[in-house]
């Protein structure tokens, strides 16, 4: 058991240290001052702004979008909102002023992000929403999203298939609709099933460094808890660290959404019970397709939903643990 806990502590420590480092290296080396490659007069310029680049998922999503655009001879200007909606609104204004032809956007907050979307809409610049929806979806040219609600459903179904009862804690990100939908899908699925009880929840903002202290407080308040449902892999890693620190690893099941390489490795090693995989490569491909449609007459669809899949110890190795699916 000490060896198992040591492996978990090492894995979480690596995740805590490596994720910010990767984000820094990404910004320094893959994204120069304007976060773009060289421009030429014949290239079309697209913009992108994500809720945070301190998350490998958004780094991967951006790299995939950039790759598709560069295959067409075009370029991408990327901005990091750093979990600040007002900053993101200003980034959209700056991208519009820079003359981009379309903007990919993952909103920081699903409701107040509308201000930024209106800035682009008023300037005739189409917005392609990726990963997390906005409150007024009609303002966007198209929204390309994972099936976030169903991701929560799949986690809950698995839990009910392996346990007759559960005392559950939630790690949430309520201002991001994608995270809220995952948790809602989970809650709706277990609702009314005797023996399955949600004891409490905490706001992690989807960040590993926030999730650990939040989970520590939840464990103090609800020492009888034995299941964690986290909105994403970074939150799950922080929650796992708190569980391990409290010596409760043996009794806890931990669920998450992302399917990150680190998350899949945790599932394969038995630390995570399951992670519901998103497919950033499919999201990026569809988002770029819709962006080109938007600047060439308009999108045929206002929303594209990309399927998710639950990864457990039984099937995770089919997807590989060295990269995203």
Language-model regions, residue ranges each:
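Hinge/cleft segment of the Venus flytrap/periplasmic-binding protein
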Residues: 10-15, 24-36, 189-190, 279-325
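Flexible loop/hinge segments that line or gate small-molecule binding clefts
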Residues: 111-150, 161, 260-268, 320
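N-terminal Sec-pathway targeting helices
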Residues: 1-18
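Short, solvent-exposed amphipathic alpha-helices that sit
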Residues: 57-74, 151-155, 178-196, 210, ...
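An alpha-beta-alpha
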Residues: 46, 65, 153-196, 200-201, ...
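Extracytoplasmic "Venus flytrap"
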Residues: 45-64, 68, 72, 77-90, ...
């Amino acid at each position: 058991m000490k060896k198992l806990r040591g492996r978990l502590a090492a894995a979480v420590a690596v995740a805590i240290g490596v994720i910010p480092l990767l984000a820094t290296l990404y910004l320094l080396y893959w994204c120069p001052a304007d976060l773009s490659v060289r421009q030429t007069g014949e290239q079309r310029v697209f913009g992108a702004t994500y809720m945070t680049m301190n998350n490998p998922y958004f780094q991967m999503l951006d790299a995939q979008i950039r790759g598709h655009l560069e295959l067409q001879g075009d370029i991408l200007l990327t901005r990091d909102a750093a979990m600040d909606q007002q900053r993101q609104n200003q980034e959209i204004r700056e991208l519009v002023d820079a003359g981009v032809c379309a903007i990919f956007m993952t909103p920081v907050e699903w409701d107040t992000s509308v201000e930024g979307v209106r800035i682009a809409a008023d300037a005739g610049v189409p917005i392609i929403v990726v990963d997390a929806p906005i409150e007024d979806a009609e303002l966007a040219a198209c929204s390309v999203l994972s099936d976030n609600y169903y991701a929560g459903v799949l986690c809950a179904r698995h839990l009910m298939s392996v346990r007759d009862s559960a005392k559950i804690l939630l790690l949430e990100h309520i201002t991001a609709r994608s995270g809220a939908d995952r948790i809602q899908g989970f809650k709706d699925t277990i609702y009314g099933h005797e023996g399955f009880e949600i004891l409490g929840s905490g706001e992690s903002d989807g960040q590993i460094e926030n999730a650990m202290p939040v989970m520590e407080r939840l464990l103090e308040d609800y020492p009888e808890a034995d299941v964690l449902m986290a909105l994403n892999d970074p939150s799950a890693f922080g929650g796992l660290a708190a569980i391990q620190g409290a010596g409760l690893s043996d009794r806890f099941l931990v669920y998450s959404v992302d399917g990150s390489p680190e998350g899949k490795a945790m599932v394969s090693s038995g630390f995570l019970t399951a992670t519901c995989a998103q497919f950033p490569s499919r999201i990026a491909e569809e988002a770029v397709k819709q962006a080109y449609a938007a600047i060439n007459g308009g999108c045929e669809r206002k929303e594209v939903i990309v399927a998710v899949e639950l990864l457990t110890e039984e099937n995770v190795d089919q997807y590989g643990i060295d990269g995203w699916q």
